[in-house]
Amino acid sequence: MSNVPAELKYTTSHEWVLHEGGGIYSVGITEHAQELLGDMVFIDLPEVGTVVAAGDDCAVAESVKAASDIYAPISGEIVEVNDDLESSPELVNSAPYADGWLFRIRISDESDLDELLDAEGYQASLEEDE
């Protein structure tokens, strides 16, 4: 069973969101997603300054198995990307909820958070998929 940290919010497309304070949220893919994709070989991240709407595809995770779009879980402006992934994309596999974060976004619409799942809801969605 995949690790689903309680302090995070989730999407049904397997992204997670962590509030960093001041309207800034870190975004990554879940342990379940990285298990499905396998070993990461490249992460195509959005440009800092890009404005995204919730649901927009804004990054791509390329693994030995497939390339998968990553969707913005909330609307806002990309304020930082994880440059470590350029040389070490495997961080998404080894630490998806820590060093393997993808980008940080300044939220523009707090109501987007209402659309996200809590850990229990995300775990239930995984069990439905099995």
UniProtKB/Swiss-Prot annotation:
Keywords: Lipoyl
Keyword Protein biosynthesis tagged: no
Domain Lipoyl-binding: 24-106
GO cellular component annotations of the record: cytosol; glycine cleavage complex
Coiled-coil blocks: none
Keyword Cytoplasm: no
GO terms classed as biological process: glycine decarboxylation via glycine cleavage system
InterPro entries per the UniProt record, alphabetical: 2-oxoA_DH_lipoyl-BS (IPR003016), Biotin_lipoyl (IPR000089), GCV_H (IPR002930), GCV_H/Fam206 (IPR033753), GCV_H_sub (IPR017453), Single_hybrid_motif (IPR011053)
Cofactors demanded by this protein: (R)-lipoate
A Pfam family this chain is assigned to: GCV_H
Source organism superkingdom: Bacteria
Residue numbers of N6-lipoyllysine PTMs: K65
Cofactor note: Binds 1 lipoyl cofactor covalently.
Function: The glycine cleavage system catalyzes the degradation of glycine. The H protein shuttles the methylamine group of glycine from the P protein to the T protein.
Entry similarity comment: Belongs to the GcvH family.
Subunit: The glycine cleavage system is composed of four proteins: P, T, L and H.
HAMAP family recorded: GcvH
Protein name: Glycine cleavage system H protein
Organism: Pectobacterium carotovorum subsp. carotovorum (strain PC1)
Gene expressing this chain: gcvH
